[in-house]
Amino acid sequence: MRKTLFSGVALAAVIAFGGSAWADVLVGIGIPVTGPNAVYGAQIQKGAEAAIKEVNDAGGINGEKIAITIGDDVSDPKQGISVANKFAADGVKFVIGHFNSGVTIPASQVYAENGILEISPGATNPQYTEQGLWNTFRTCGRDDQQGTVAGQYIFDHFKDAKIAVIHDKTPYGQGLADETKKKLNELGTKETLYEGVNVGEKDFSALIAKLKQAGVNVVYWGGMHPEAGLLIRQMADQGLKAQFISGDGIVSNELASIAGDAVAGVMNTFGPDPRDDKANAELIKAFRDKGFEPEAYTLYSYAAVQSLAQAAKAAGSNDPQEVAKAMKEKGPFKTVLGDLSYDEKGDPKLPGYVMYKWEKGADGKYNYIQQ
Protein backbone atom coordinates (compact mmCIF):
# COMPACT_ATOMS: atom_id res chain seq x y z
CA MET A 1 0.00 0.00 0.00
CA ARG A 2 1.31 3.43 -0.96
CA LYS A 3 0.93 6.44 1.29
CA THR A 4 1.75 10.05 0.43
CA LEU A 5 1.34 13.24 2.40
CA PHE A 6 1.05 16.75 1.05
CA SER A 7 0.02 20.12 2.45
CA GLY A 8 -2.11 21.96 -0.11
CA VAL A 9 -0.21 21.21 -3.30
CA ALA A 10 3.19 20.37 -1.81
CA LEU A 11 3.91 16.67 -2.32
CA ALA A 12 6.10 14.78 0.14
CA ALA A 13 7.89 11.45 -0.05
CA VAL A 14 6.16 8.19 -0.83
CA ILE A 15 6.17 5.56 1.88
CA ALA A 16 5.44 2.03 0.75
CA PHE A 17 4.36 -0.66 3.17
CA GLY A 18 2.92 -4.10 2.56
CA GLY A 19 2.48 -5.62 -0.87
CA SER A 20 3.11 -3.67 -4.02
CA ALA A 21 4.20 -0.06 -3.71
CA TRP A 22 1.74 0.94 -6.43
CA ALA A 23 -1.83 -0.20 -5.85
CA ASP A 24 -4.81 -0.09 -8.15
CA VAL A 25 -7.36 1.97 -6.20
CA LEU A 26 -6.21 5.32 -4.81
CA VAL A 27 -8.06 6.65 -1.75
CA GLY A 28 -7.43 10.19 -0.56
CA ILE A 29 -7.68 11.10 3.11
CA GLY A 30 -8.46 14.82 3.25
CA ILE A 31 -7.95 16.09 6.79
CA PRO A 32 -6.40 18.80 8.96
CA VAL A 33 -2.98 17.25 9.56
CA THR A 34 -1.86 20.58 11.01
CA GLY A 35 -3.71 23.53 12.49
CA PRO A 36 -6.17 23.84 15.39
CA ASN A 37 -8.17 20.73 14.47
CA ALA A 38 -5.26 18.37 13.84
CA VAL A 39 -6.43 16.10 16.66
CA TYR A 40 -9.55 15.25 14.65
CA GLY A 41 -7.49 14.76 11.50
CA ALA A 42 -5.37 12.21 13.37
CA GLN A 43 -8.51 10.35 14.44
CA ILE A 44 -9.80 10.18 10.87
CA GLN A 45 -6.42 9.12 9.49
CA LYS A 46 -5.89 6.39 12.10
CA GLY A 47 -9.39 5.01 11.58
CA ALA A 48 -9.16 4.99 7.79
CA GLU A 49 -5.68 3.47 7.70
CA ALA A 50 -6.67 0.66 10.07
CA ALA A 51 -9.78 -0.16 8.05
CA ILE A 52 -7.89 -0.03 4.75
CA LYS A 53 -5.28 -2.43 6.13
CA GLU A 54 -8.08 -4.80 7.09
CA VAL A 55 -9.59 -4.56 3.59
CA ASN A 56 -6.22 -5.07 1.89
CA ASP A 57 -5.35 -8.03 4.14
CA ALA A 58 -8.61 -9.62 2.99
CA GLY A 59 -7.71 -9.14 -0.69
CA GLY A 60 -8.70 -5.53 -1.35
CA ILE A 61 -11.84 -4.40 -3.16
CA ASN A 62 -12.85 -6.51 -6.13
CA GLY A 63 -9.34 -7.95 -6.19
CA GLU A 64 -7.58 -4.57 -6.24
CA LYS A 65 -5.51 -3.26 -3.34
CA ILE A 66 -6.04 0.22 -1.90
CA ALA A 67 -3.35 2.91 -1.81
CA ILE A 68 -3.54 5.98 0.39
CA THR A 69 -2.63 9.59 -0.26
CA ILE A 70 -3.06 12.15 2.51
CA GLY A 71 -3.87 15.82 1.97
CA ASP A 72 -3.55 18.46 4.69
CA ASP A 73 -6.39 20.97 4.38
CA VAL A 74 -5.42 22.82 7.60
CA SER A 75 -9.19 23.30 8.22
CA ASP A 76 -9.07 26.03 5.57
CA PRO A 77 -11.58 26.06 2.65
CA LYS A 78 -9.00 27.33 0.14
CA GLN A 79 -6.50 24.67 1.16
CA GLY A 80 -9.30 22.12 0.96
CA ILE A 81 -9.93 23.04 -2.67
CA SER A 82 -6.18 22.75 -3.36
CA VAL A 83 -6.18 19.30 -1.79
CA ALA A 84 -9.25 18.31 -3.83
CA ASN A 85 -7.64 19.45 -7.09
CA LYS A 86 -4.44 17.59 -6.23
CA PHE A 87 -6.40 14.44 -5.46
CA ALA A 88 -8.17 14.74 -8.82
CA ALA A 89 -4.87 15.24 -10.66
CA ASP A 90 -3.40 12.20 -8.92
CA GLY A 91 -6.24 9.91 -9.97
CA VAL A 92 -7.93 9.51 -6.57
CA LYS A 93 -11.22 7.62 -6.86
CA PHE A 94 -12.52 7.87 -3.31
CA VAL A 95 -12.01 10.37 -0.48
CA ILE A 96 -12.39 9.82 3.24
CA GLY A 97 -12.88 13.37 4.55
CA HIS A 98 -12.93 16.18 4.97
CA PHE A 99 -13.57 17.03 8.62
CA ASN A 100 -14.76 20.64 8.73
CA SER A 101 -18.03 21.43 6.98
CA GLY A 102 -16.59 24.66 5.60
CA VAL A 103 -13.89 22.64 3.86
CA THR A 104 -15.98 19.62 2.92
CA ILE A 105 -18.69 21.52 1.05
CA PRO A 106 -16.51 23.32 -1.54
CA ALA A 107 -14.21 20.30 -1.89
CA SER A 108 -17.21 18.07 -2.67
CA GLN A 109 -17.96 20.16 -5.75
CA VAL A 110 -14.45 19.57 -7.10
CA TYR A 111 -14.82 15.87 -6.42
CA ALA A 112 -18.21 15.69 -8.15
CA GLU A 113 -16.81 17.30 -11.29
CA ASN A 114 -13.91 14.83 -11.33
CA GLY A 115 -15.85 11.63 -10.69
CA ILE A 116 -14.66 11.17 -7.10
CA LEU A 117 -16.85 9.77 -4.32
CA GLU A 118 -16.48 11.46 -0.91
CA ILE A 119 -17.42 10.13 2.53
CA SER A 120 -17.02 12.56 5.43
CA PRO A 121 -16.78 11.23 8.99
CA GLY A 122 -17.26 14.68 10.50
CA ALA A 123 -18.99 17.26 8.26
CA THR A 124 -22.37 17.84 9.91
CA ASN A 125 -23.67 20.93 8.10
CA PRO A 126 -26.87 19.88 6.25
CA GLN A 127 -25.82 21.77 3.11
CA TYR A 128 -23.16 19.13 2.38
CA THR A 129 -25.70 16.50 1.33
CA GLU A 130 -28.38 19.00 0.27
CA GLN A 131 -26.42 20.13 -2.80
CA GLY A 132 -27.97 17.48 -5.02
CA LEU A 133 -24.58 15.96 -5.90
CA TRP A 134 -24.19 12.27 -6.66
CA ASN A 135 -21.01 11.80 -4.63
CA THR A 136 -21.64 13.16 -1.12
CA PHE A 137 -21.86 10.78 1.84
CA ARG A 138 -21.22 11.01 5.57
CA THR A 139 -21.10 8.57 8.47
CA CYS A 140 -21.94 11.25 11.06
CA GLY A 141 -25.29 12.94 11.63
CA ARG A 142 -26.45 16.42 10.62
CA ASP A 143 -26.63 19.67 12.54
CA ASP A 144 -30.37 19.98 12.05
CA GLN A 145 -30.66 16.68 13.97
CA GLN A 146 -28.03 17.67 16.53
CA GLY A 147 -29.44 21.14 17.08
CA THR A 148 -32.91 19.71 17.61
CA VAL A 149 -31.62 17.37 20.33
CA ALA A 150 -29.65 20.17 22.02
CA GLY A 151 -32.50 22.67 21.86
CA GLN A 152 -35.00 20.18 23.26
CA TYR A 153 -32.60 19.20 26.06
CA ILE A 154 -32.01 22.82 27.07
CA PHE A 155 -35.76 23.51 27.01
CA ASP A 156 -36.54 20.42 29.10
CA HIS A 157 -33.79 20.81 31.70
CA PHE A 158 -33.23 24.58 31.99
CA LYS A 159 -36.68 26.13 32.07
CA ASP A 160 -36.74 29.89 32.55
CA ALA A 161 -32.96 30.04 32.07
CA LYS A 162 -31.31 32.98 30.37
CA ILE A 163 -29.58 31.40 27.39
CA ALA A 164 -26.70 32.73 25.34
CA VAL A 165 -26.04 31.19 21.92
CA ILE A 166 -22.41 31.78 20.89
CA HIS A 167 -20.76 30.59 17.66
CA ASP A 168 -17.46 30.80 15.79
CA LYS A 169 -18.87 32.20 12.51
CA THR A 170 -17.97 29.04 10.56
CA PRO A 171 -20.41 26.95 8.48
CA TYR A 172 -20.22 24.27 11.17
CA GLY A 173 -20.28 26.42 14.30
CA GLN A 174 -22.84 28.99 13.22
CA GLY A 175 -24.88 26.31 11.47
CA LEU A 176 -25.12 24.24 14.65
CA ALA A 177 -25.83 27.28 16.81
CA ASP A 178 -28.59 28.39 14.45
CA GLU A 179 -30.21 24.95 14.45
CA THR A 180 -30.18 24.89 18.27
CA LYS A 181 -31.55 28.43 18.41
CA LYS A 182 -34.23 27.48 15.88
CA LYS A 183 -35.44 24.60 18.05
CA LEU A 184 -35.47 26.74 21.19
CA ASN A 185 -37.45 29.43 19.38
CA GLU A 186 -39.93 26.84 18.08
CA LEU A 187 -40.47 25.74 21.69
CA GLY A 188 -41.19 29.32 22.71
CA THR A 189 -37.80 30.11 24.28
CA LYS A 190 -36.01 33.26 23.14
CA GLU A 191 -32.28 33.45 23.65
CA THR A 192 -30.99 36.30 25.80
CA LEU A 193 -27.86 36.80 23.71
CA TYR A 194 -26.69 35.68 20.27
CA GLU A 195 -23.03 36.43 19.48
CA GLY A 196 -20.31 35.38 17.06
CA VAL A 197 -16.59 35.25 17.84
CA ASN A 198 -13.59 34.65 15.61
CA VAL A 199 -11.78 31.35 15.23
CA GLY A 200 -8.47 31.68 17.06
CA GLU A 201 -9.82 34.13 19.65
CA LYS A 202 -7.87 33.89 22.92
CA ASP A 203 -9.36 36.52 25.22
CA PHE A 204 -13.09 36.28 25.95
CA SER A 205 -13.16 38.85 28.77
CA ALA A 206 -15.44 41.29 26.94
CA LEU A 207 -17.87 38.53 25.97
CA ILE A 208 -17.94 37.12 29.50
CA ALA A 209 -18.61 40.57 30.94
CA LYS A 210 -21.57 40.87 28.56
CA LEU A 211 -22.83 37.41 29.60
CA LYS A 212 -22.60 38.32 33.28
CA GLN A 213 -24.35 41.64 32.77
CA ALA A 214 -27.20 39.85 30.97
CA GLY A 215 -27.54 37.31 33.80
CA VAL A 216 -26.90 34.37 31.49
CA ASN A 217 -26.93 30.95 33.18
CA VAL A 218 -26.77 28.67 30.11
CA VAL A 219 -24.17 29.11 27.35
CA TYR A 220 -24.60 27.15 24.13
CA TRP A 221 -21.44 27.04 22.01
CA GLY A 222 -21.37 26.30 18.29
CA GLY A 223 -17.74 25.73 17.43
CA MET A 224 -14.61 23.72 18.12
CA HIS A 225 -12.75 22.69 21.27
CA PRO A 226 -9.78 25.13 21.19
CA GLU A 227 -11.98 28.20 21.65
CA ALA A 228 -14.46 26.30 23.83
CA GLY A 229 -11.73 25.26 26.27
CA LEU A 230 -10.52 28.82 26.69
CA LEU A 231 -14.05 30.16 27.05
CA ILE A 232 -14.90 27.56 29.70
CA ARG A 233 -11.73 28.27 31.68
CA GLN A 234 -12.15 32.04 31.50
CA MET A 235 -15.82 31.83 32.49
CA ALA A 236 -14.78 29.99 35.66
CA ASP A 237 -11.89 32.36 36.33
CA GLN A 238 -14.17 35.38 35.99
CA GLY A 239 -16.91 33.96 38.20
CA LEU A 240 -19.56 33.21 35.59
CA LYS A 241 -21.46 30.18 36.85
CA ALA A 242 -23.34 29.03 33.78
CA GLN A 243 -24.01 25.61 32.29
CA PHE A 244 -21.87 25.18 29.17
CA ILE A 245 -23.39 23.03 26.40
CA SER A 246 -21.99 22.34 22.95
CA GLY A 247 -21.91 19.85 20.10
CA ASP A 248 -19.60 17.31 18.50
CA GLY A 249 -16.93 19.93 17.84
CA ILE A 250 -15.61 19.58 21.39
CA VAL A 251 -15.33 15.78 21.58
CA SER A 252 -11.59 15.68 22.15
CA ASN A 253 -9.69 15.03 25.35
CA GLU A 254 -7.75 18.17 24.46
CA LEU A 255 -10.78 20.12 25.72
CA ALA A 256 -9.97 19.05 29.29
CA SER A 257 -6.32 19.97 28.81
CA ILE A 258 -7.31 23.51 27.83
CA ALA A 259 -10.22 24.06 30.23
CA GLY A 260 -8.71 22.32 33.26
CA ASP A 261 -11.04 21.46 36.13
CA ALA A 262 -13.60 23.92 34.76
CA VAL A 263 -14.53 21.23 32.21
CA ALA A 264 -16.38 19.30 34.92
CA GLY A 265 -20.10 19.32 34.14
CA VAL A 266 -19.74 20.60 30.57
CA MET A 267 -22.24 18.88 28.27
CA ASN A 268 -22.23 18.09 24.56
CA THR A 269 -24.14 16.16 21.94
CA PHE A 270 -22.58 13.36 19.89
CA GLY A 271 -23.63 10.03 18.41
CA PRO A 272 -23.72 6.89 20.56
CA ASP A 273 -20.10 5.92 21.35
CA PRO A 274 -19.10 2.86 19.27
CA ARG A 275 -16.37 2.10 21.82
CA ASP A 276 -19.16 0.89 24.11
CA ASP A 277 -20.22 -1.80 21.62
CA LYS A 278 -18.82 -5.15 22.78
CA ALA A 279 -18.53 -6.23 19.14
CA ASN A 280 -15.75 -3.64 18.76
CA ALA A 281 -13.78 -4.70 21.85
CA GLU A 282 -10.97 -6.42 19.93
CA LEU A 283 -10.54 -3.49 17.56
CA ILE A 284 -10.56 -0.96 20.41
CA LYS A 285 -7.90 -3.00 22.21
CA ALA A 286 -5.75 -3.07 19.06
CA PHE A 287 -5.82 0.73 18.86
CA ARG A 288 -5.04 1.13 22.55
CA ASP A 289 -2.21 -1.40 22.38
CA LYS A 290 -0.60 0.96 19.87
CA GLY A 291 -1.00 3.90 22.24
CA PHE A 292 -3.94 5.51 20.46
CA GLU A 293 -7.36 6.10 21.99
CA PRO A 294 -9.97 5.64 19.20
CA GLU A 295 -12.30 8.38 20.41
CA ALA A 296 -14.70 10.61 18.54
CA TYR A 297 -14.25 10.32 14.75
CA THR A 298 -11.83 7.37 14.63
CA LEU A 299 -14.49 4.73 14.20
CA TYR A 300 -16.66 6.97 12.03
CA SER A 301 -13.74 6.99 9.59
CA TYR A 302 -13.28 3.24 9.98
CA ALA A 303 -16.97 2.74 9.13
CA ALA A 304 -16.63 4.96 6.06
CA VAL A 305 -14.01 2.60 4.63
CA GLN A 306 -16.04 -0.47 5.59
CA SER A 307 -19.18 0.75 3.85
CA LEU A 308 -17.19 1.86 0.80
CA ALA A 309 -15.52 -1.55 0.44
CA GLN A 310 -18.76 -3.47 0.91
CA ALA A 311 -20.62 -1.24 -1.55
CA ALA A 312 -17.89 -1.77 -4.16
CA LYS A 313 -18.21 -5.52 -3.69
CA ALA A 314 -22.01 -5.29 -3.99
CA ALA A 315 -21.63 -3.21 -7.16
CA GLY A 316 -19.04 -5.58 -8.58
CA SER A 317 -17.14 -2.48 -9.64
CA ASN A 318 -14.66 0.07 -8.30
CA ASP A 319 -16.12 2.82 -10.45
CA PRO A 320 -17.09 5.63 -8.03
CA GLN A 321 -20.48 6.28 -9.61
CA GLU A 322 -21.40 2.59 -9.46
CA VAL A 323 -20.20 2.41 -5.86
CA ALA A 324 -22.25 5.52 -4.98
CA LYS A 325 -25.34 3.87 -6.42
CA ALA A 326 -24.68 0.71 -4.41
CA MET A 327 -24.14 2.69 -1.22
CA LYS A 328 -27.64 4.12 -1.56
CA GLU A 329 -29.33 0.92 -2.72
CA LYS A 330 -27.45 -2.10 -1.37
CA GLY A 331 -27.20 -1.48 2.38
CA PRO A 332 -27.16 -2.10 5.22
CA PHE A 333 -23.40 -2.57 5.51
CA LYS A 334 -21.77 -4.20 8.52
CA THR A 335 -19.64 -1.58 10.26
CA VAL A 336 -18.22 -0.63 13.64
CA LEU A 337 -21.15 1.80 13.94
CA GLY A 338 -23.60 -1.06 13.44
CA ASP A 339 -25.69 -1.78 10.36
CA LEU A 340 -25.19 1.29 8.18
CA SER A 341 -27.43 2.36 5.30
CA TYR A 342 -27.47 5.63 3.36
CA ASP A 343 -30.46 7.55 2.05
CA GLU A 344 -30.73 9.14 -1.39
CA LYS A 345 -28.83 12.22 -0.23
CA GLY A 346 -25.97 10.22 1.25
CA ASP A 347 -26.95 10.74 4.88
CA PRO A 348 -26.64 7.74 7.21
CA LYS A 349 -29.64 5.98 8.69
CA LEU A 350 -28.17 5.73 12.17
CA PRO A 351 -29.33 6.34 15.76
CA GLY A 352 -29.47 10.04 16.49
CA TYR A 353 -27.54 12.24 18.87
CA VAL A 354 -27.33 11.72 22.61
CA MET A 355 -26.10 13.91 25.46
CA TYR A 356 -22.72 13.55 27.18
CA LYS A 357 -21.33 15.12 30.36
CA TRP A 358 -17.66 15.67 31.14
CA GLU A 359 -16.76 13.93 34.40
CA LYS A 360 -13.56 13.01 36.22
CA GLY A 361 -12.83 9.28 36.22
CA ALA A 362 -11.14 7.08 38.81
CA ASP A 363 -7.86 7.72 37.01
CA GLY A 364 -8.20 11.44 37.68
CA LYS A 365 -8.75 12.26 34.02
CA TYR A 366 -11.81 13.96 32.55
CA ASN A 367 -13.82 12.30 29.81
CA TYR A 368 -17.21 12.74 28.19
CA ILE A 369 -19.71 10.18 29.51
CA GLN A 370 -23.00 9.34 27.82
CA GLN A 371 -25.98 10.33 29.95
Curated annotation (Swiss-Prot):
The UniProt family comment states: Belongs to the leucine-binding protein family.
Q: Which residues are the signal sequence here?
A: 1-23
Superkingdom is Bacteria
Q: Which residue ranges does UniProt annotate as crossing the membrane?
A: none
Give one Pfam hit by family name.
Peripla_BP_6
Is Transport one of the keywords UniProt gives this record? Answer: yes
Question: Which organism does this record belong to?
Answer: Brucella abortus (strain 2308)
Protein name listed in UniProt:
Leu/Ile/Val-binding protein homolog 1
Spell out the InterPro entries in the cross-references. Leu-bd, Leu_Ile_Val-bd, Peripla_BP_I
List keywords of the entry alphabetically.
Amino-acid transport, Signal, Transport
The answer, when asked if Endoplasmic reticulum is one of the entry's keywords, is no
Query: What does the record give as the function of this protein?
Result: Component of an amino-acid transport system.
